Structures are given as C-alpha cells and as structure tokens.
Amino acid sequence: MALAKEIMGISLLEKSSSFMNSSSMALFNPNNYHKENHLWFNQQFQGRRNLSRRKAFRQSTMAAISENLIKVVPEKAVRFKVRAVVTVRNKNKEDLKETIVKHLDAFTDKIGRNVTLELISTDMDPNTKGPKKSNQAVLKDWSKKSNLKTERVNYTAEFIVDSNFGNPGAITVTNKHQQEFFLESITIEGFACGPVHFPCNSWVQPKKDHPGKRIFFSNQPYLPDETPAGLKSLRERELRDLRGDGKGVRKLSDRIYDYDIYNDLGNPDKGIDFARPKLGGDDNVPYPRRCRSGRVPTDTDISAESRVEKPNPTYVPRDEQFEESKMNTFSTSRLKAVLHNLIPSLMASISSNNHDFKGFSDIDNLYSKGLLLKLGLQDEVLKKLPLPKVVSSIKEGDLLKYDTPKILSKDKFAWLRDDEFARQAIAGVNPVSIEKLQFFPPVSKLDPEIYGPQESALKEEHILGHLNGMTVQEALDANKLFIVDHHDVYLPFLDRINALDGRKAYATRTIFFLSDVGTLKPIAIELSLPQTGPSSRSKRVVTPPVCATGNWTWQIAKAHVCANDAGVHQLVNHWLRTHASLEPFILAAHRQLSAMHPIYKLLDPHMRYTLEINGLARQSLINADGVIEACFTPGRYCMEISAAAYKNWRFDLEGLPADLIRRGMAVPDSTQPHGLKLLIEDYPYAADGLMIWGAIESWVRDYVNHYYPSSAQVCSDRELQAWYAETINVGHVDLRNEEWWPTLATPEDLISILTTLIWLASAQHAALNFGQYPYGGYVPNRPPLMRRLIPDENDPEYAVFLADPQKYFFSALPSLLQATKFMAVVDTLSTHSPDEEYLGERHQPSTWTGDAEIVEAFYKFSAEIGRIEKEIDERNANTKLKNRCGAGVLPYELLAPSSGPGVTCRGVPNSVSI
C-alpha cells in the first residue's frame, strides 16, 4: 500500500502544508485537529476493502465526528485557504473567429466575465439543508496566459473554507466567456486528506449557451447507496442533464445522450435511388439503436431523418467528439480528404480507357510508380491535404503513390497459394467466421419453399481425395474438417445484388482440411445462385485444380469466397458486432451511471470516441451511395444484410470463449489454462485472444469483487440495474424479448457482462480492424467486390475466358477506380492516431480513481498485458507455429497490445475509436 499511498497523494501532505500558511486569517492546522477527524479524512481517502468493513467503520467514525461537531464546531470552527490547480488544454489550431473571440475573452476576463469555481462538500450544511459550499473563486491570470502556445495551461484559484467543511466531493464551474474551453483536470490542495483530484476531460460551454453550472465529481468512486449526503442531489441532477427530454434538434455543444433508429442513412429527397429502408423498430428489419440527433424529417418521407452532409459535422454529445490530435489524424483531415478531394480526383483521372487493371504490373505500379492524376486536380490544394500515409506522396508529374501492403512484404506471391488463402481464415483480418464442420454435407437453414433445397451440392467424391486417406466420417470424427459458410447470409440477396450494374456474387461455402502439421488447406468451394426453376442448376462445386483451366477457375472461385468474406467481415463481424451493438451500452452508461459510479469509471476508457466514429460512419461510410456501398459486393443492400445478421446476434455468445465453443473451434477443458481446448492448436487469433480475454477477466473480477462482495449489492444497485435494463429494453429493444439475455443478479453475472464489453471494444475490434489495409490493400488478395461470375462451358463468355484467362480474372476484380478508392479508405480505417490509448493504459493512470487498491490492481493488469505482448512476440518467432512463422509468413500481431501511430497491423486500443 505504500506505493498506492504515494500515488494517491498522501505523502504530499507535508509538501502542501506550507501553502496553508496565511497572514490574513486563522489557519487550520492538521496537527491540532482532533485525531478522530484526521483519521477519518485519511481512511475515507484510502481504498475500500469490503462493504461490511466500510459500513462498520463509517458508523463508528461518524459517531466520533458527530460528537466532536457538537462540542467543537459552533465555537471553534476556523477558516483556512485551499488552492485549485486547473489544467486547461489549448487548441493547436484556431480559425480566425476563434482567435478573435479568444482575445475578447482575455480582455473581458479582467472585468468580471470570467471563469468561476465553487467547491461542494460531501457533507450537508445543517443550516441550509443543502451541501456545504465554499465561496466562489475566480480562475486567476486567464488574460495573462491566454496567448501561451503550450499544449496545456495551468491556472489557479483560491477558496476559503471552514475546518468543518469536510471533504470536497464535487466542484462546479461557470464559464462566463464567449467560447468553450477544454477542462482536463482540477486538483485541490490544502485539505488534511491530501490532494483531491477531479478528472474532468470535458468541454465547458459558455454560460450564455448553457446557463447551468457544470458539475465535476472527485475521483473517489461511490455506489449509489453510499453517495455522501452532500452529493446525492448533484449526482441525480447530472444524470438528468445528460438524459435530456427527448425533444428538439440537438446542438453540437449539447451533452445529451438519447436513442433513435437508423433512419438517416438514405436521402429520399435526392431521388428513389438514394432512399434506404429504416433499420430498427420493425420486426422484419431489427437493429440496435443509435445516438439521437433530433433532426427534422425529409420532405419526401416523414419517417426518414434529414441528413447532415459532409463536410458539416453530425451530432454526437460534445465530449464524444474527437480530440484535436485524433481529428487531425482521422476525422476532419484524413477521411474527409479522401472522400472530398482524393476520390473525386481519382474519378476524374481514371477514364473509361483504363477502367480495368490490365495485369499484375498495373497493381504493382500503384506502389512502385504511382497513379497519374489528371492535370490540374493535384494543384496546391490537393498537395497540402493531410492525406493518409498510404498515399505516400504527390510528386512532380502528378503521381499518387500507395504504400506497399504488408501481405506483399515477405512474399509477393503468397496470396496466390492455397495455404495462405486458408491461413488467413484463422490469422487474417476476419478470423471469426471459420467453424468446425459438424456434419457433411452442410445444410442450409433457409426456408426451402423460398430458396430451394437445403442440401448442399457437395459430395464425398469432391473431397475424398484430399483427406490423407481418411473417409469423410473419419475426418469429421478427428476434427479435421472446417468450413467458412456464407451461404445463408448472401443467398436471400443474390437476385437483387446480381441485378446491380457491375456486381456479381455467389453464396459461398469453403471446406478446409487440417493437416498433420497444423495448417489448413482448402479442398472444395461451393458456389450457389438462386434457383430460377425446378430443373435449373443453381449450385456448382470447384475443387483444387489439376489442369491450367481448372487453375484459373479455382483462382476466380477463391476470389468470390474472399469477396463474400470481405462483406461479412465488414457488415457483420466488424460494423454490427463491434460498432453498432456497443452503442446502446454506451448511451445507457452515460444516461444511467453517474461519473462517480465505479462501473462507469471502469468502462470509461472503453467508450472513448465510439459514438463519434459511428456518427461519422452513418454520414460517410454506410450511408446511401457511401463508401461501403460503393466498395462492397452487396452495394445498396449492404445494411440490409447487416440487419438480417442482427436477428441472429446474441450478446451471451459474444465473449471469446463462448464464441469459440459456438463455432466448434474449442471445447471446454478444465485442464487447459483458459478452460478451453482449441481444435486447431495453432489458431493465432484464438490463442492470443484467450490470453487477453483472461487478463481482462482477471482485472474485471478484482474490480467487481472489490465493490460487490455479494449478490445483494449487485441487485440493490439501482444505477447498475437501470443501465443494463435500458440497454436491453431501449437500446436493443428489437431483441428485448429474447431469452438468451444474461441476467444481472450476481457478481459473476456482472464480471461476465463487463468482460465481454471490454473484450469487444478492445481486442475483438482490433483483430477485425487494423489488418484491413495490410491484407486488403492488395486487391487480388482480398477483393471487396466481384464483377463477373465464372462462365460455364455453355456460356458465350467461356471462349473469352479460355482465350485470355488473366484478362478475364482482372475484369472480374474491382475496377481501377473501385480499387484505388477502396485502398485509400481502408488505409485510413487501419490507422492508429497519435493519442491512441491502448489496453493496459489510462489517461492519468494514477488519479483516474481515488481508490488506492484499485490503482494497484490496474497496474497489475497493465503488467500482465505487457507480459502477454512478450509472449506474442515469442510465438511469432516459434517455427513450430506455422500459421504465424515461416518463409514468407506474416507474424500474427493484430492482438499485440501496443503500437506506434499509423498503419502498423498491430495494437489493441481501449475502445472502438476508428
């Protein structure tokens, strides 16, 4: 505990005591203060141990305090001075208006239009029947320091309080300036308990726009029924303010969290081609809720919300917006540069004469030579854009050069090999679709009356020659057969997809065989189309080639599998399962959990930026005619596929162990470190993921057990229960009646729910996101869409295919424009920002909580994450693990916790922040 005490500031008492001397007033001397009160201050500040000890202690010490107050306070209360150190973060860049207003605020600050603070005690004032308050203190030297160019500026303010004031539990801030400012933290010095920290990290709006005082609580956590009397009303008021009243159009400066359906993806006022179905609020099209903005409806469809088109920002609560360094990396710079400037330049530069890649050299030239932009489009404006790192340079001669994706870094031709195609199913950007094949042949779950026979076209003879002498049943029994099955996801949409101009798709199934050395090989691909008649041929099976024609057919079939997989990865596993499904949990947390609630403090870093990135996605990525529709096979039906998948989403199976068991990739085994035995021992995503899952679970268990020693505390925590109930009944209302929702009645229930949420926000999202450019930036390896089917021998195109199979192959891949647009966008989405906060890290790691035992537990968790990173490095150097180490094999680093900025193909941020 010595370390923790030093961290929490107890050892600073002597250093801060000199500040308490003043010639103008009587001093409060901690050494002369009654021992009982001094003890109470210090022990209240220390970490909690268990509920019964805390309550017993509080009863005895409060009795002592009450006795002392009766005897001493009326006659001997003394006044003393305490100081606030207030840290404000400056903007690096200001526009002309902001600069003018900043100077105006500096001038008017001198004449009373300033920033004032007021301390609120944890104790009640018996006279006012409200919390004890200090005098209002003015932030000093704002005008003098307004021109400082440093990232942070420290201001001070002085308060006068009585010796019976108690502990400061909250502080109010009033901004009488014309402009908002970012308040990072406040530290109060001069109390007997030592420095009191107030982590703020919030924009404080001008009083003229938001009349109420802003409330900030100290870092001391309190469960609702343990809230000190002086803070109870403030706790409730702050939550009411954050909930709002559900009415009106939200202003960008608002801090209101509320729910709405996805009714803002289309723009019917632009025409029927831009209208899109509403997602959510319909049993046929269920979807999680998103953050409400309250915009007026469109003119054409009153149920559709009008859009805010780029570059204007869409609403998210002010504190959810990207901080400046993140903005410069992503929001206003990178993605907008790509969407508004680079892509139009590409569209204007790529004529119909060079619509397709002519060969592999054309793709290679994007990295080695660059793309020639049309004259005039690159001029000074384009040259000054903060384009993604992938766009390395715009040189003289109008060249736009892309960085070489990591998939080409070790072996330029690795992507062509079947073993690499299979390896990416367990160690690529979408390692969560593969399943154990439970029976052969596989069977569809779709309605046969609508979609035809459920039976697969796969037969034993298709795969028997690839089973190393086993029968199919023997291979099944030996856990040797695996499948990536996208049949039921795509088949209901194929008629509509294939009617789109330049889009062609199958519903695919791919069978893999596990070799004796632990690697996979693809042994059959089934390609299905909707049945057009009772005797029509709607399914075909392609197997590894034995001739030249078969080789090209096999390559195109694998490309169709990759396009299917890219769509499922982006629309279901990535967007739906880690972005959209988490948003209701985040909205409910802000609405129902006080900032002083220990569970809010635990979840806070794992909610950072998610609402902003989701809002930006609705505006520019998943919207009608947006990047996702333009770049992926389903086109305008992308989000309908996502909504169809939501019908099968289950929160109780989103944790890693449950997901692995659901997919048959692991079986329970109490003798194994994580209670699971992997069927593929060298399954990099699962093997590394289980280590991280275990570390998160251990940290959450320590945390939860510290505050909830029994089920009674869980059940009686009204804020906690309201958070979970609102998440289900409002945020995921379309699935609220499902029986699989976990209960929240015991500490173990809470541990499971929180571990799953933190896993999804951190490691699961990282595994699915940061490999997008490293693997998908080379389009032949992972085409996001396909434009041609494989011709049958009776098709007129078959002769064209035979005459020039390479040309046919490239004509089936995305066009040059589609590919370059996709490459630029996924590079941006694969990028870490400089201010990224990784798993095991926290902003202000020593002061985010006032609970010393929890600080120590967090450092223990952080150390375990560091140990896991070293273990991952060792695994990537182990030649026995052939799915992550070998000639030309990429190491699996997507779950390596730390990373530098940029596109690194590694790093696990705390939250879904891109």
UniProtKB/Swiss-Prot annotation:
Any Gene Ontology CC annotation: chloroplast thylakoid
Pfam families assigned: Lipoxygenase, PLAT
Keyword entries, A-Z: Chloroplast, Dioxygenase, Fatty acid biosynthesis, Fatty acid metabolism, Iron, Lipid biosynthesis, Lipid metabolism, Metal-binding, Oxidoreductase, Oxylipin biosynthesis, Plastid, Thylakoid, Transit peptide
Enzyme Commission number(s) of this protein: 1.13.11.12
Organelle transit peptide: 1-83
Binding residues for Fe cation: 574, 579, 765, 769, 914
Pathway the protein takes part in: Lipid metabolism; oxylipin biosynthesis
Signal peptide (UniProt feature, chain positions): none
Hydrolase in keyword set: no
Localization per Swiss-Prot or TrEMBL: Plastid, Chloroplast stroma; Plastid, Chloroplast thylakoid
Induction entry: Up-regulated locally and systemically 30 minutes after wounding. Up-regulated by jasmonate and abscisic acid treatment. Not induced by pathogen infection.
Tissue expression as described in the entry: Expressed in roots and leaves. Detected in tubers and flower buds.
Domain Lipoxygenase: 221-914
SMART domains: LH2
Reactions accelerated catalytically: (9Z,12Z)-octadecadienoate + O2 = (13S)-hydroperoxy-(9Z,11E)-octadecadienoate; (9Z,12Z,15Z)-octadecatrienoate + O2 = (13S)-hydroperoxy-(9Z,11E,15Z)-octadecatrienoate
Single biological process term from Gene Ontology: fatty acid biosynthetic process
Bound cofactor: record note: Binds 1 Fe cation per subunit.
Lineage: superkingdom: Eukaryota
pH dependence: Optimum pH is 6.0.
Cofactor(s) essential for the protein: Fe cation
Every PLAT domain range: 96-218
Extra facts: Depletion of LOX-H3 by co-suppression-mediated gene silencing leads to higher tuber yield, but has no effect on the number of tubers per plant.
Subunit record text: Monomer.
PANTHER family: LIPOXYGENASE
Family, as annotated: Belongs to the lipoxygenase family.
The protein's name in its UniProt record: Linoleate 13S-lipoxygenase 3-1, chloroplastic
Gene that specifies this protein: LOX3.1
